[in-house]
Design a protein with these regions (language model features):
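Outer-envelope exported proteins of Gram-negative bacteria
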Residues: 45, 210-212, 216, 290, ...
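Trp/Phe/Arg-rich N-terminal binding region typifying the photolyase-homology
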Residues: 1-80
Length: 493
C-alpha cells in the first residue's frame, strides 16, 4: 500500500430515512466525500448480521451481510417495494442514533414483501448466487430459519436435539422443507445484500478508494459457523464449550473481559491445513480490499477461560498457531493486504510474530501521551510499516478524550505537537498522524467533526448504548472535505 489516508465510518453510521445506514445513496455520497477529501480508504466495521447487543463483532455468520444494510429505496427503484410500504413505518425518532428495536420490528416484514415479489422474478440470478456461495449460504439460511422457528434462541437451546446437533442429512432436509419460506427469505436477502454491496464496491474502486474491513478473530457461539462446523471449535460431545475467549485482568479492568466466544480447535485446524481460515478469508475478500485482523495477538497466545466462569480472572494463556496460520493466509492471498491489530499485551512473542509476518501493526495517538511511561505510540518512534489511528471504534473521539485524559497527558500532547487554539485541538492531533511516516493514517469521522460526549461508537465492557452513533445529513460538507484534502496533500498522502 502506498502512503495514503482514510476515514473510519461504519455503514450503520450513515444517514438514511430508515433508521440505520445502508448501502444506498448516503453510502455513495460518503464515497464522493472521501474522494473530494483526498482519502483513498474507507474503513468499516464488520458487515455481518448482528445479534442481541447489536455488536458487529458478534454476528450470526462470518460470511453473511447484515439485512439492515439493504437499501430500501433501491428496492423501490427495482420494483420490489412500494414507497407507501416503508414511508409511514416507525424507524426511530432520533436521527443521531440507531434504534435497533424499532428497526427489528419493521425491517423484516418489509423485506419479506421484497422477497415475495422478487424470488421468482430473480430465480436465475439467485440460482447463480447460490452456486457461487454453496459453501456457506445453505447452512446460514437454514440456521436463521431454525432460529425463527425456535423463538430466535441460539442453537444450543433448540429443543430438537436432532437439528441442534445436525444428526443426519435427512434431518437437515426435513427442516429445509418445513421452513422453506424462511430459508428462501434469508437466501434472497443475501442475494440482495451482495448485489447492492458489489455495486457500491465497484463505485468505490472507480474513485480509487479501497475498503478496509475488520475480521474478528473469534466468531459467536450463536452463529451458523459454529453450528455447521462444531469440530473446528473446543466443544464437548454435546457441543458445549470447554473454554471460552477473553482477556486477562489489567490496569483498566480488575476482572478482565469475558468475551465468551468458543475457542478454536487449533490442532484439528492445522491438521486440515487451516482450510476453515482459508475459506473465511476468501469470503472476506469478496467484501474488502484490506483486512484488519482483530486481536492479532491471539494468534501468538490467547486467554482461555473455563466455561461457566463469570469473569475472566481464572483464565490462562495458551499458545496460538503463530506463523503456521499467518504464513498460510498470506501465501494463499498474495493480492490481499492485511493489518494486524496488535494492541494490548505487546509481549516479545507478539512483537516477534508481527515482525515475522511482515504485516503492519497499529499505532493509536490517544495512547501516545500517557505521561506515566515512554510510548511506542509517539509518532517519532514509528516505522513506515504501520497504520496510525487517532483512535479506534473502541476509543473516545478526540474531543471527548481531551476532557477525559489526565491534564498532564493533554499538556504533553500540546507540547509535543505544538497544539494551538487557532488550528484547534483535534486538527493538531490529526496533523500529528498525517505528518507521521506511517504508511496509512486513519481518523474517526467524529474527529473531523470535532464531536465528543455522546458520540462514541463503542465503550468496551458495556452492554447498551453502543453501535448507535450516526452522521447527520449535511455534516460531511464540501468545506470539510476541502480542509481534509489540504492537509492530506500537504503531507503527501
Amino acid at each position: 500500500m502506498n502512503r495514503c489516508s482514510g476515514i473510519l465510518m461504519p455503514v450503520f453510521s450513515l444517514p438514511s430515512p430508515y433508521g440505520i445506514g445502508t448501502l444506498g445513496k448516503a453510502a455513495y455520497d460518503f464515497a464522493d466525500f472521501l474522494h473530494a477529501a483526498g482519502q483513498r480508504c474507507w474503513q468499516m466495521l464488520p458487515l455481518g448480521p448482528t445479534s442481541y447487543g447489536d455488536s458487529p463483532y458478534q454476528s450470526f455468520s462470518t460470511y453473511a451481510g447484515n439485512p439492515y444494510f439493504i437499501d430500501l429505496d433501491m428496492l423501490i427503484e427495482d420494483g420490489l417495494l412500494e414507497k407507501s410500504e416503508v414511508q409511514d413505518l416507525n424507524w426511530g425518532t432520533e436521527p443521531r442514533y440507531v434504534d435497533y428495536g424499532k428497526i427489528y420490528e419493521s425491517r423484516f416484514a418489509v423485506l419479506q414483501k421484497a422477497k415475495d415479489r422478487g424470488w421468482v422474478r430473480d430465480r436465475e440470478a439467485v440460482a447463480a448466487f447460490q452456486a457461487e456461495n454453496s459453501r456457506w449460504l445453505p447452512d446460514y439460511a437454514l440456521y436463521m430459519a431454525c432460529k425463527r422457528h425456535f423463538g430466535m434462541r441460539s442453537w444450543t437451546e433448540w429443543e430438537d436435539a436432532d437439528i441442534r446437533l445436525r444428526k443426519s442429512p435427512e434431518v437437515l432436509e426435513r427442516y429445509r422443507t418445513l421452513l422453506r419460506d424462511d430459508v428462501e427469505l434469508f437466501t434472497y436477502l443475501q442475494f440482495l445484500f451482495y448485489r447492492q454491496w458489489n455495486k457500491l464496491r465497484d463505485y468505490l474502486h472507480g474513485l480509487d478508494i479501497q475498503v478496509i474491513g475488520d475480521l474478528p478473530i473469534y466468531v459467536a457461539m450463536d452463529s451458523a459457523d459454529v453450528w455447521a462446523e462444531p469440530e473446528s471449535f473446543q466443544l464437548d460431545d454435546q457441543c458445549v464449550p470447554t473454554e471460552v475467549s477473553g482477556v486477562p485482568p489489567d490496569y483498566f479492568s480488575a476482572e478482565g473481559q469475558l468475551w465468551g466466544n468458543p475457542l478454536y480447535a487449533w490442532d484439528r485446524m492445522q491438521a486440515d491445513g487451516f482450510g476453515w481460515w482459508i475459506r473465511r478469508v476468501d469470503g472476506a475478500s469478496k467484501l474488502y480490499d484490506v483486512i484488519r485482523i482483530d486481536h492479532f495477538r491471539g494468534f501468538e497466545a490467547y486467554w482461555a477461560v473455563p466455561y461457566g466462569e463469570t469473569t475472566a480472572k481464572n483464565g490462562h494463556w495458551v499458545k496460538g498457531p503463530g506463523m503456521n496460520l499467518v504464513g498460510v493466509l498470506t501465501g494463499w492471498f498474495p493480492q490481499l493486504r492485511f493489518i494486524a491489530e496488535d494492541l494490548g499485551y505487546p509481549t516479545p512473542g507478539v512483537r516477534q510474530l508481527l515482525q515475522d509476518s511482515g504485516l503492519p501493526g497499529m499505532k493509536v495517538l490517544e495512547f501516545a501521551f500517557d505521561s506515566r511511561d515512554s510510548s511506542s505510540y509517539l509518532p517519532h518512534s514509528y516505522g513506515e510499516n504501520c497504520v496510525c489511528y487517532t483512535g479506534t471504534h473502541d476509543n473516545s473521539p478526540l474531543a471527548l478524550w481531551k476532557d477525559e485524559a489526565a491534564p498532564e497527558d493533554i499538556a504533553y500532547a500540546r507540547e509535543y505537537l505544538g497544539l494551538n487554539d487557532e488550528e484547534g485541538f483535534n486538527w493538531g492531533l490529526i496533523r500529528g498522524g498525517m505528518s507521521s511516516v506511517a504508511r496509512l493514517f486513519v481518523a474517526q469521522m467524529q474527529d473531523y467533526l470535532e464531536l465528543g460526549l455522546h458520540h462514541r461508537t463503542n465503550v468496551p465492557g458495556t452492554q447498551s448504548g453502543n453501535w448507535q452513533w450516526r452522521l447527520l445529513p449535511g455534516e460531511a460538507t464540501p468545506a470539510l472535505a476541502r480542509r481534509i484534502r489540504h492537509m492530506t496533500e500537504m503531507y503527501g498522502r
